[in-house]
Amino acid sequence: MSFHITPIWMWKGTGNNYAYLLTCDKTKITAIVDPAEPESVIPVIKEKTAKKEIDLQYILTTHHHYDHAGGNEDILSYFPSLKVYGGKNASGVTYTPKDKEIFKVGEVQVEALHTPCHTQDSICYYVSSPSKRAVFTGDTLFTSGCGRFFEGDAKQMDYALNHVLAALPDDTVTYPGHEYTKSNAKFSSTIFSTPELTKLVDFCKNHESTTGHFTIGDEKKFNPFMCLGLESVQKAVGSSDPITVMKKLRDMKNAA
């Protein structure tokens, strides 16, 4: 069953977070992903509900950090019947899906993919229908980048990006938790050069928002954190061991 996704930009100019509405086209049943800033998301929810464009039933939380889960309790005060999916450490959570557990939003299939590293409760949500695929990656995968290893290490991030997410179909559209693409692409350009990365840099010059425009297949071509085996990336960090490459890339990005 088909679906559509509506990004909501929060804390624009500071945190530059995204919440997302995931709506089943047939039933209008909707989940909202990481609605951390109620002031930004509640008016959108109310307007779309009044127009009968959505039937909000779920919150999907990618991890427990305040700028992702901190709005859950406030949202619940307005919409107390919502089911809140996420890690057990996240505010307001009523259900923690197991790794690779499948559930439905309306008639749309969603799979919870545990990707511990940025936090140990990080979950990506893979959405699929016969016609298209998408994944909400929180602070695990950013466009041409990845999250900091606050609660994990390079080995965990390598597994999350290059085993779990890389195994998704290449046409899976990515929806990260922040708008960091311009700075990520700038850093990536100091590591290696590909035609796809050049196009991404150009895209950022003309588009303030980049979420929903790129895919897992694109990430494999312009994200150095997903190109650990590429000779140019290995040369940039001085190692060919994938875990060491991942760690050095993250250290370099942190210092950039």
Swiss-Prot record:
Organism this protein belongs to: Schizosaccharomyces pombe (strain 972 / ATCC 24843)
Name any Gene Ontology BP term: cellular detoxification
What is the protein name given in its UniProt record?
Probable hydroxyacylglutathione hydrolase glo2
How the cofactor binds, per note? Binds 2 Zn(2+) ions per subunit.
Indicate the family of this protein. Belongs to the metallo-beta-lactamase superfamily. Glyoxalase II family.
The pathway where this protein functions is: Secondary metabolite metabolism; methylglyoxal degradation; (R)-lactate from methylglyoxal: step 2/2
Molecular-function GO terms, alphabetical = hydroxyacylglutathione hydrolase activity; metal ion binding
For this UniProt record, the keywords arranged alphabetically read as follows: Cytoplasm, Hydrolase, Metal-binding, Nucleus, Zinc
- For the ligand (substrate), the binding residues are 148, 178-180, 250-253
- Functional summary from the UniProt entry: Thiolesterase that catalyzes the hydrolysis of S-D-lactoylglutathione to form glutathione and D-lactic acid. Involved in the metabolism of methylglyoxal, a toxic compound for yeast proliferation, by converting methylglyoxal to lactate via S-D-lactoylglutathione by sequential enzyme reactions catalyzed by glyoxalase I and glyoxalase II.
User: Which reaction does this chain catalyze?
Assistant: an S-(2-hydroxyacyl)glutathione + H2O = a 2-hydroxy carboxylate + glutathione + H(+); (R)-S-lactoylglutathione + H2O = (R)-lactate + glutathione + H(+)
Membrane is among the record's keywords: no
Which residues are Zn(2+) 1-binding?
63, 65, 118, 139
EC supergroup of this enzyme: hydrolase
